[in-house]
């Protein structure tokens, strides 16, 4: 069972695996999951990149995210700044850096002649995902799986399917108004409907307030060590 204690215990291992600060409970739970899978199989297939290329994320659908002139998965920088002191915040200026990186990516997004404004925006969101969000998730999957000795293969990241789907019209990707409808339709007759048409379930993270309490205690322990980074 992946409980709060397991996620805290594996958080240290997840940071080692990433060699950087990681995505906290989401990453430690994945590391724990990989450690269980590798006991039965040394190679596995994962679903990374399906949401990026088939348009499964909320920012493809929610108007607030869709129209935001910033990375849609980082619309609020405040939680990311809470652990930084004021001097660092002033020197780094996270909002300015993010806006610059966002605009640079938007400017280099390939355009398709004849697209209306909404379709052009969907193309921009797709490109933002491919350039930034997908890279983060791929790196996470690679590092957490290999840390456990598990080889994770990502068929949806095959450049041929990525290139093909980049130009598939939205009404096909969202076939019959269903999120990732094209992907679901492709699986008909192969997978049962209860699997094909179930609601998206984000990778396990916890909303248990006890996790936050345990994590806070661990952070205080680190901060109490003068030699801690």
Give the residues covered by each predicted segment.
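Short Ser/Thr-interspersed hydrophobic loop/turn segments at strand-loop and sheet-helix junctions
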Residues: 130-143, 165
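Short hydrophobic-aromatic micro-motifs
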Residues: 44-46, 128, 134, 163, ...
């Amino acid at each position: 069972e992946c409980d709060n204690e397991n996620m805290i215990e594996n958080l240290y291992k997840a940071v080692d695996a990433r060699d950087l600060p990681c995505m906290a409970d989401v990453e430690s739970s994945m590391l724990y999951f990989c450690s269980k899978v590798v006991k039965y199989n040394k190679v596995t297939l994962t679903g990374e990149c399906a949401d990026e290329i088939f348009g499964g994320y909320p920012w493809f659908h929610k108007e607030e995210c869709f129209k935001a002139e910033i990375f849609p998965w980082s619309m609020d920088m405040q939680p990311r700044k809470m652990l930084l002191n004021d001097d660092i915040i002033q020197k780094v200026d996270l909002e300015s850096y993010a806006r610059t990186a966002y605009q640079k990516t938007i400017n280099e997004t390939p355009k398709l002649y004849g697209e209306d404004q909404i379709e052009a925006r969907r193309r921009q969101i797709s490109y933002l995902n491919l350039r930034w969000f997908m890279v983060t998730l791929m790196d996470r999957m690679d590092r957490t799986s290999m840390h456990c000795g598990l080889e994770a293969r990502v068929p949806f990241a095959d450049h041929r399917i990525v290139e093909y789907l980049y130009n598939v019209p939205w009404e096909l990707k969202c076939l019959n108004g269903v999120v990732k409808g094209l992907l679901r339709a492709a699986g008909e007759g192969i997978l049962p409907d209860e699997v094909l048409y179930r609601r998206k379930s984000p990778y396990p993270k916890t909303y248990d307030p006890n996790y936050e309490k345990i994590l806070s205690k661990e952070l205080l322990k680190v901060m109490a060590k003068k030699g801690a980074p």
